[in-house]
Amino acid sequence: MQVKTPVQEIMVLRDFINNLSVHQSPSSDVSALLPRKIGEKWYQSGLRYSAEYPYPYTYSTGSFSSGTQYFMPFTALEDATITTLEIQCTVAKADATIHLGIYASDSNNDVAVPLFTSDPISCSTSGIKNASCNVQIVKGKVYWLSILPIGTPAFLRNAQDSLFPIKGSTSASSMAPLGYCTTNNTSMTQSAPTSKLDTYGSLPRVMFVTT
């Protein structure tokens, strides 16, 4: 029996690791891209999570265009059930409302059909605005959080300091987009959005609660 040298042993181990990574499903194994999980689960019951999780969030607010529906992606870190969508309204406006929603993705991870869209929620007073839902998410799949403000209330927001771009920038001097939007809406789309625009700068910080 031939005894392998230490260098040969290392080469065998390296080949094994490379073959293992090739045969793993890229849609379900996100561990290599993530910090270490703290606790038993990524999504702990009753806590709030948003598109930047588990990366840092810079606390700030922003105002957004009336009639514009915003879409921001996140990748499910584990199987879970979303029971609530939520956002913090920081500046109220009389007669202002919002819709909250979550959308599936297609085979290219682009925004697709809705899994839940809420009825109008009043933003005539500031504070937490939420909608109950029952949406199953699956580890490794991409989902799109969404909001449609009618009127001009302000919210906590995500921006370049906390969200990853969804694709590259168009020039060396421009920002990369963080999500999508559609304009001139009175209600949330009930199908995959068409004529969507890239969104730069900031997006409303829609959050979700799981069980």
Across the structure, where does each feature detected by a protein language model lie?
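A short, structured loop/turn motif at beta-sheet edges
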Residues: Q136-V142
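Exposed aromatic-hydrophobic patches
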Residues: G127-V135
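Beta-sheet-rich sandwich/jelly-roll-like modules and their strand-loop junctions
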Residues: D29-S107, V142, L148-T211
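N-terminal low-complexity, intrinsically disordered "leader/linker" segments enriched in small/polar
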Residues: M1-Y49
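Solvent-exposed, conformationally flexible loop/turn segments
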Residues: G67, S124-I128, G140
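Short Trp-Ser/Thr-centered turn/loop motifs at beta-strand boundaries
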Residues: V113-D119
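Predominantly extracellular beta-rich ligand-binding scaffolds that present long acidic/polar faces
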Residues: N108, C123
